[in-house]
Regions:
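Short, flexible, surface-exposed loop segments at domain boundaries
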Residues: 1-26, 47-109, 119-141
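Homeobox/homeodomain signature
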Residues: 3, 28-30, 42
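Glycine-centered tight beta-turn/hairpin loop motif at sheet-sheet or coil-to-beta transitions
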Residues: 31-35, 103-105
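A cross-kingdom feature marking solvent-exposed beta-strand/loop segments within repeated
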Residues: 34-50, 113-122
């Protein structure tokens, strides 16, 4: 996964409509400042295979290196979509062996109850350091 070119958008699903093919749909996400449309296809990774619905708070990642139409509201191909709980955040980044994100904005503090799994939901029992990780977190002081 070429996460380096992925951009995250967090917001609430305002609308879901039929796409241009039988295997796609258009998801309108309202952020704090604007509406952004995402094309969701069979190639889009939806974490935990959750059925996306209007009103859900989501994080959608799109690849900034792909072409996008110059339209308003903006429209991107969703590469990854995940549902977020209230006050939950998510990041997709490389974490070093000390579990510090590549941009030094996040340090992971794992506990025995920390759930670590692969993209297909299998338990991951190895050290997650030196890996690209999708990390869910809440702010702590």
């Amino acid at each position: 996964m070429a996460y380096e070119t992925y951009q995250k958008v967090i917001g609430s699903i305002q609308n879901i409509s039929r796409g241009t093919s039988c295997c796609s749909f258009l998801m309108a996400v309202q952020t704090e400042t604007e509406t952004i449309n995402f094309v969701v296809t069979g190639e889009t990774l939806v974490i935990d295979n959750i059925r996306l619905r209007r009103g859900m708070r989501v994080a959608a990642f799109y690849d900034t290196s792909l072409p996008a139409p110059a339209i308003y509201p903006p429209q991107y191909q969703a590469e990854l979509v995940t549902v977020l709980r209230q006050n939950q955040n998510v990041t997709l980044d490389y974490f070093d062996r000390n579990l510090v994100s590549e941009d030094n904005s996040l340090k992971l503090n794992l506990s025995p109850t920390t759930r670590i799994s692969t993209l297909n939901g299998q338990r991951f029992s190895c050290n997650p350091g030196d890996e690209e990780l999708l990390v869910y977190y809440t702010n702590t002081t």
